[in-house]
UniProtKB/Swiss-Prot annotation:
Keywords: Cytolysis, Secreted. Its main location: secreted. Presents moderate hemolytic activity at physiological concentrations (micromolar range), and weak lactate dehydrogenase (LDH) release from mast cells. Does not induce mast cell degranulation, and antimicrobial effects. In vivo, injection into mice causes moderate edema formation, but induces very weak or no change in nociceptive sensibility. It also causes an alteration in rearing (standing on hind limbs), but does not impact locomotion. GO terms for biological process: killing of cells of another organism. One of its GO terms (cellular component) is extracellular region. The keyword Secreted applies. The lineage of its organism: Eukaryota, Metazoa, Ecdysozoa, Arthropoda, Chelicerata. This is Cryptide Pep-9.
C-alpha cells in the first residue's frame, strides 16, 4: 500500500 507523506 502507498505510504502517505508525513510532514
Amino acid at each position: 500500500k502507498p505510504v502517505e507523506p508525513v510532514g
